[in-house]
Amino acid sequence: MASLLQGLSASPGSGLPINQDLLLMQKGMLMRKVRSKSWKKLRYYRLQDDGMTVWHARQAGGRAKPSFSISDVETVRGGHESELLRNLAEEFPLEQGFTIVFHGRRSNLDLVANSVEEAQVWMQGLQLLVDFVTNMDQQERLDQWLSDWFQRGDKNQDGRMSFGEVQRLLHLMNVEMDQEHAFQLFQTADTSQSGTLEGEEFVEFYKSLTKRAEVQELFENFSSDGQKLTLLEFVDFLQEEQKEGERASDLALELIDRHEPSDSGKLRHVLSLDGFLSYLCSKDGDIFNPTCLPIYQDMTQPLNHYFINSSHNTYLVGDQLCGQSSVEGYIRALKRGCRCVEVDIWDGPNGEPVVYHGHTLTSRIPFKDVVAAIAQYAFQTSDYPVILSLENHCSWEQQEMIAHHLTEILGEQLLSTTLDGQLPTQLPSPEELRRKILVKGKKLRTLEEDLEEEEEEPEESELEGEQEAELELEAQFESEPQELSPRSKDKKKKVKAILCPALSALVVYLKAVSFYSFAHSREHYRFYEISSFSEAKAKSLIKESGNEFVQHNTWQLSRVYPGGLRTDSSNYNPQEFWNAGCQMVAMNMQTAGLEMDLCDGLFRQNAGCGYVLKPDFLRDAQSSFHPERPISPSKAQTLLIQVISGQQLPKVDDSKEGSIVDPLVRVEIFGVRPDTARQETSYVENNGFNPYWGQTLCFRVLVPELALLRFVVKDYDWKSRNDFVGQYTLPWNCMQQGYRHIHLLSKDGISLHPASIFVHICIREGIEGVES
């Protein structure tokens, strides 16, 4: 068992060659940690010998504490990409600064080195380690995980572990074990009889801890000799249990080649118990169907036929009143596959518009910085179109600057006219709009008028009259959502701000209009117009006119946004709006929790491209579907989930050394109202390492096409609310049957490898007599 650095600096074939940057990082360097213009402090940073963690101290030789793990790092950026470091460019050369970007919602770490050379050492060294960790295979990740635990358990850092150190480590690893049994395993692993465990001996000790009786029993059920699975036996398992069907024979050969550790086993086309376990724990044995991982849906249908991953107040990385506005909000949203971002624009100093949450204490960022970030990151995760939802509060002059920045910075990426210059009859498809950025906002004229032959420019007074007739800035109809009626519109105070023609012209397929009624929309609106709904208004429409809302969303786009009282940036449940076919259900992406788990779960499929094709009954203009009262269709199904066991569940609170989790598993179904249900297992006392439940849960689902499953592991507490341990959410239609592992994620959606739960999934057609 080698540490990462040993792997990096060893002989060829063991990883990366010896690297001077990493050796210098191990010696440590004094750098300046920057949080704001007023908070800049010297810290001594050092890469630990394990090659996986960076510690810091106030000075060289001072008391050090962990700063971050390499596995937590997503990427490293140069100083010129940090808005904070750019603001300090007069104080520190940008070339000496760099930013460490973490997975999830953890704040970036901005550092300034003493020289350009030292900054390069850390930037290059860190990125080298990040790339190495990212490309680790399943076994390498497990080896590194074991190495991390060995480092934590080896208190005196002498490279060996006494039985006392092993006992402490077992508590850290969530293992409650009889001392006599633990000592017996310890002695068996101590082949050198030194009274301590060294690297490979510790690995053997770990293997004895992690023997999976339930997997061995399953293996022996299909193995004639209990030692191996022949090719035919493995094919039987894949067909009978894993429901792999006709492809089982070819798949069996692939899986043996991929997972059987012995070369002789591969040659004989047999699978050992170790190979069988490797298969079950790998992506091949995952609950998420691999056929749903790439782009597998039809991407040539009109935009309104898709659910679109959408963000609310994208610029905020905190709450709605005092939170920080940052281009980082856009970068994070786009990199996680978001395809619709919101830009709230106000007049700024020196003629430059700014982005912030108006009439609040949130900080302000230049609009041009936001556009530059969007230009850079729009298509790093997905090639499919990005929608800029503009909330325009600016004067005529600064609107011209908005149009200028959009045109100049986005260039060819910006869609400024219809695709072929002709009047379309429906919205274009994501495929047709690849790598294009669309503007959603108010528009002075219709698309038909825009596409007419060149006419004499209208007088400004005509524009103002036209504006008064039809324009209300988006801010007005979003802050006072669609309780308007055509009559009450006249009583409403007019907004006299004039929309700049240059900005209006950039709105092509997504003209924002106020919603009055479904009948009004059918009579007066066109397919390229889009209405926004507050969550309260959308809920009311679903309840009162659910089928009309579904039909409305078959020909026009709808955007739903969180209510104004959510000042803490909390989220609503997006599922009820997806049930009505609403395409753009905007989420506060900076806030983790159940609601974002559902959003991440839906958009996990289709390569995470941000577009998911709606079910056929949400695309049919004559659909009779009502999300509140779905008639039981022929596609109704019954789900049987046997929750078998858990593996290496993390501690809820690392500060409580003696505490061990009492895990239970809750399975939740989200979909149409009759399908929404939850059930949970009993809890297992004092065992987060390898708990066993062996309990079966049963659900009936009327509309599986809309259902999401969320698996949650909780730490039972009889005195208070159960603590969250981990979760995983996926669409019903992406679930694989059979014996599957569910690899858990943190609240922030980060892998908790190797934490997982082992289940058996069985789906039966039709409704069986079960209560859920």
UniProtKB/Swiss-Prot annotation:
<feature type="region of interest" description="Disordered">
    <location>
        <begin position="448"/>
        <end position="470"/>
    </location>
</feature>
<feature type="binding site">
    <location>
        <position position="313"/>
    </location>
    <ligand>
        <name>Ca(2+) 3</name>
    </ligand>
</feature>
<feature type="binding site">
    <location>
        <position position="154"/>
    </location>
    <ligand>
        <name>Ca(2+) 1</name>
    </ligand>
</feature>
<feature type="binding site">
    <location>
        <position position="165"/>
    </location>
    <ligand>
        <name>Ca(2+) 1</name>
    </ligand>
</feature>
<dbReference type="InterPro" id="IPR017946">
    <property type="entry name" value="PLC-like_Pdiesterase_TIM-brl"/>
</dbReference>
<dbReference type="Pfam" id="PF00387">
    <property type="entry name" value="PI-PLC-Y"/>
</dbReference>
<dbReference type="Pfam" id="PF09279">
    <property type="entry name" value="EF-hand_like"/>
</dbReference>
<dbReference type="InterPro" id="IPR001711">
    <property type="entry name" value="PLipase_C_Pinositol-sp_Y"/>
</dbReference>
<dbReference type="GO" id="GO:0016042">
    <property type="term" value="P:lipid catabolic process"/>
</dbReference>
<dbReference type="GO" id="GO:0005886">
    <property type="term" value="C:plasma membrane"/>
</dbReference>
<keyword id="KW-0443">Lipid metabolism</keyword>
<feature type="region of interest" description="Substrate binding">
    <location>
        <begin position="33"/>
        <end position="60"/>
    </location>
</feature>
<dbReference type="InterPro" id="IPR011992">
    <property type="entry name" value="EF-hand-dom_pair"/>
</dbReference>
<feature type="binding site">
    <location>
        <position position="190"/>
    </location>
    <ligand>
        <name>Ca(2+) 2</name>
    </ligand>
</feature>
<dbReference type="InterPro" id="IPR001849">
    <property type="entry name" value="PH_domain"/>
</dbReference>
<feature type="compositionally biased region" description="Acidic residues">
    <location>
        <begin position="449"/>
        <end position="470"/>
    </location>
</feature>
<keyword id="KW-0106">Calcium</keyword>
<feature type="binding site">
    <location>
        <position position="344"/>
    </location>
    <ligand>
        <name>Ca(2+) 3</name>
    </ligand>
</feature>
<feature type="binding site">
    <location>
        <position position="715"/>
    </location>
    <ligand>
        <name>Ca(2+) 5</name>
    </ligand>
</feature>
<dbReference type="Pfam" id="PF00169">
    <property type="entry name" value="PH"/>
</dbReference>
<feature type="binding site">
    <location>
        <position position="192"/>
    </location>
    <ligand>
        <name>Ca(2+) 2</name>
    </ligand>
</feature>
<dbReference type="GO" id="GO:0001965">
    <property type="term" value="F:G-protein alpha-subunit binding"/>
</dbReference>
<feature type="domain" description="EF-hand 3">
    <location>
        <begin position="213"/>
        <end position="244"/>
    </location>
</feature>
<feature type="binding site">
    <location>
        <position position="686"/>
    </location>
    <ligand>
        <name>Ca(2+) 4</name>
    </ligand>
</feature>
<feature type="binding site">
    <location>
        <position position="717"/>
    </location>
    <ligand>
        <name>Ca(2+) 5</name>
    </ligand>
</feature>
<feature type="active site">
    <location>
        <position position="312"/>
    </location>
</feature>
<protein>
    <recommendedName>
        <fullName>1-phosphatidylinositol 4,5-bisphosphate phosphodiesterase delta-4</fullName>
        <ecNumber>3.1.4.11</ecNumber>
    </recommendedName>
</protein>
<dbReference type="InterPro" id="IPR000008">
    <property type="entry name" value="C2_dom"/>
</dbReference>
<feature type="binding site">
    <location>
        <position position="660"/>
    </location>
    <ligand>
        <name>Ca(2+) 4</name>
    </ligand>
</feature>
<feature type="binding site">
    <location>
        <position position="194"/>
    </location>
    <ligand>
        <name>Ca(2+) 2</name>
    </ligand>
</feature>
<feature type="binding site">
    <location>
        <position position="662"/>
    </location>
    <ligand>
        <name>Ca(2+) 4</name>
    </ligand>
</feature>
<comment type="function">
    <text>Hydrolyzes the phosphatidylinositol 4,5-bisphosphate (PIP2) to generate 2 second messenger molecules diacylglycerol (DAG) and inositol 1,4,5-trisphosphate (IP3). DAG mediates the activation of protein kinase C (PKC), while IP3 releases Ca(2+) from intracellular stores. Required for acrosome reaction in sperm during fertilization, probably by acting as an important enzyme for intracellular Ca(2+) mobilization in the zona pellucida-induced acrosome reaction. May play a role in cell growth. Modulates the liver regeneration in cooperation with nuclear PKC.</text>
</comment>
<dbReference type="InterPro" id="IPR000909">
    <property type="entry name" value="PLipase_C_PInositol-sp_X_dom"/>
</dbReference>
<keyword id="KW-0539">Nucleus</keyword>
<comment type="subunit">
    <text>Interacts with GRIP1. Interacts (via GBA motif) with guanine nucleotide-binding protein G(i) alpha subunit GNAI3 (inactive GDP-bound form); low-affinity interaction.</text>
</comment>
<dbReference type="Pfam" id="PF00388">
    <property type="entry name" value="PI-PLC-X"/>
</dbReference>
<dbReference type="InterPro" id="IPR035892">
    <property type="entry name" value="C2_domain_sf"/>
</dbReference>
<dbReference type="GO" id="GO:0004435">
    <property type="term" value="F:phosphatidylinositol-4,5-bisphosphate phospholipase C activity"/>
</dbReference>
<feature type="domain" description="C2">
    <location>
        <begin position="619"/>
        <end position="746"/>
    </location>
</feature>
<feature type="domain" description="PH">
    <location>
        <begin position="23"/>
        <end position="131"/>
    </location>
</feature>
<feature type="binding site">
    <location>
        <position position="716"/>
    </location>
    <ligand>
        <name>Ca(2+) 5</name>
    </ligand>
</feature>
<feature type="binding site">
    <location>
        <position position="342"/>
    </location>
    <ligand>
        <name>Ca(2+) 3</name>
    </ligand>
</feature>
